[in-house]
A protein has these predicted regions:
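Short beta-strand/loop segment that forms part of the nucleotide-sugar
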Residues: 36-45, 64-66
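Glycine-rich, basic loop-to-helix element that forms the pyrophosphate-binding segment
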Residues: 65-83, 93
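Short aromatic/hydrophobic "clamp" motif used to bind/position activated sugar donors
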Residues: 88
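Conserved donor NDP-sugar-binding/catalytic core segment of glycosyltransferases
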Residues: 96-146
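Short, flexible, basic/aromatic active-site loop/helix in glycosyltransferases
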Residues: 138-170
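A short, conserved alpha-helix in the catalytic core of glycosyltransferases
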Residues: 171-206
Length: 206
């Protein structure tokens, strides 16, 4: 059954991530504007009591359960068909969001219909003065086809000194925290299911 939603569906894919949910889901619940967003967890047939925990602790978080582990791409593709919303934010289960995180993303997408997808600046959880390897400040592809990010090239991670606070066009937005228009996601037929995990967001944005 398709679930009616608010303007934004914040969607977390989970597989046996109980410890991560305990650590990071509270920030998503506490700092996401309920007026414009709903929170979903798509579960890939977890066996670690993830779902009972969510239902017990977060009654406002909606849960979609798969009958087997479909991986990242197929897990999202199948689950998102059941969620009706203008925008999806695909959020990794190990991401801590901060107060006010949602507003700038929503404002940007609303301001320009030509923007298909976007991401925020993503900082390391363990060292918040540095960028996170997965996505940093936006993704690009070099002339040989290798992906890199503003703030991270190969294993070199930059310190965040505000050098990438400006809005700019990027080649790909990180699946760590990817906001995309739902219509575009479905028109592109979602992620390529041949990507079980990793690199699928680059393929989608391409």
């Amino acid at each position: 059954m398709i679930q009616k939603n608010k303007r934004i569906a914040i969607v977390i894919l989970n597989y046996n991530g109980l410890n991560l949910l305990k650590k990071f889901l509270p920030s998503v619940v506490n700092f996401s504007d309920e007026k414009i967003s709903s929170i979903y967890v798509i579960d890939n047939c977890s066996t670690d009591n993830s779902i009972p925990y969510i239902k017990r602790k977060f009654s406002n978080v909606k849960v979609i359960c798969h009958k087997k582990n479909l991986g990242y791409s197929s897990g999202y593709n199948k689950g998102l068909k059941l969620i009706k919303s203008d925008y999806y934010i695909l959020l990794n289960s190990d991401v801590e969001v901060s107060k006010g995180w949602l507003g700038p993303l929503f404002k940007l997408m609303e301001s320009d219909k030509n923007i298909a997808a976007c991401q925020p600046k993503i900082l390391s959880y363990k060292n918040k003065t540095k960028f996170e390897y997965a996505g940093a400040a936006g993704g690009f592809v070099d002339m040989l086809g290798y992906p890199f990010c503003r703030g991270r090239i190969f294993d070199t991670i930059e310190e965040d000194r505000g050098q990438y606070d400006n809005k700019t066009q990027i080649f790909w937005a990180s699946g760590c925290c990817l906001m995309i228009r739902s219509k575009i996601f479905h028109n592109c037929k979602g992620f390529d299911n041949s990507f079980f995990a990793h690199m699928e967001e680059i393929d989608l944005c391409w």
